Amino acid sequence: MESLGKAAVAEFVATFALIFVGAGAVIVASSGQLDLVGVALAHGFVLAVMVSVTGHISGGLVNPAVTIALWTAGRIGTQRGAVLIVAQMVGAVLGALLLRY
């Protein structure tokens, strides 16, 4: 269970970072200070870093759709999939909420 807890924290942090940096780049772009290439680079860099950092802990899934696909294909168990999806969703929501305020 300890490794599942670490994986959940890793997925929470990775998904939080992706949403916070990615959506933050979109917000900056909407003010005219960043173009589409900058938004794409922000998403690409944060995703590359988060997958690299969390890959050995949780698999670097970062996206509930990826987790659902792996669960559906039988590559991860139901308990692990459910915990990681919840962690990813909470990370995404908190990342977006932090940008809002």
Predicted regions and their residues:
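Membrane-interface helix-loop junctions and terminal tails of multi-pass membrane proteins
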Residues: M1-Y101
